Regions:
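Catalytic cores of DNA base-excision repair glycosylases
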Residues: 2-226
Length: 226
């Protein structure tokens, strides 16, 4: 399958969006959040819950078990009890145990630094072969653990990108990852990701976007129409 190439219009619009949001939010520096194995677990815990809840559940998990090896060896019921504060613990506990054991069986450890040496597409393919690891989870690991130019697309980014027409109306969230990555230079992917999240949370909300407060009014095709 041929690699997607964005139109010049979308590339230029993304440049203007990034420039405007950079003026508003300033430089957001990349710093590694967790190692890749921990990021994998954290991402599972973050599904369908708030950042506060997922952070609490992750801290509880690591404080209790100390290492990912111990989590992988633990009973599912024990994991479930420890992560209960994060929500959907009954679904997430077996998912965490299963994927950790799959990774350990394949690699022998939870050191995934070898992914940095792979082409980005191959690193994504390697990660998404594991149960429960989709494009978003793979992109989060590659972006937040290694600083690679992978674009995680959450609900905020997906919504804002649709309204800005950076992606087409029929593109789903999974496809949005491959469509949004190439519209900005690789070194700006993390910044662009963070800018769109902040804009989605602060201004371009789902139900009542504050277009009157938006600094993208001259750029956005949906300005005042949502």
């Amino acid at each position: 399958m041929a690699k997607y190439k964005p139109t010049k219009l979308r590339i230029e619009r993304a440049r203007r969006v990034s420039e405007s949001l950079s003026a508003k939010y300033g430089l957001i520096e990349w710093v590694p959040r967790y190692n890749a194995g921990e990021e994998l677990v954290y991402t599972i815990l973050s599904q369908h819950t708030s950042d506060i809840n997922s952070e609490r559940a992750f801290k509880n998990l690591m404080n209790h078990f100390q290492t990912l090896d111990a989590v992988a060896d633990a009973d599912v019921d024990d994991i479930e009890q420890v992560i209960r504060s994060g929500g959907l613990a009954r679904q997430k506990a077996p998912r965490i145990k299963r994927v950790l054991n799959e990774v350990k069986q394949e690699v022998g450890s939870f050191d995934l630094s070898f992914l940095m040496e792979m082409p980005l597409d191959q690193a994504k393919k390697w990660l998404t072969k594991f149960n429960g690891v989709g494009p978003k989870t793979a992109a989060i690991i590659l972006c937040f653990s290694f600083g690679l130019p992978a674009m995680p697309v959450d609900t905020h980014i997906f919504r804002v990108a649709k309204r800005l027409k950076l992606i087409g109306p029929k593109i789903n969230a999974d496809k949005a990852h491959e469509r949004l990555e190439p519209i900005v230079p690789p070194e700006e992917v993390f910044q662009f990701h963070m800018y769109l999240i902040k804009h989605g949370r602060d201004t371009c909300s789902a139900r009542f976007p504050r277009c009157n407060e938006c600094n993208l009014g001259e750029i956005c095709p949906s300005f005042g129409k949502v």
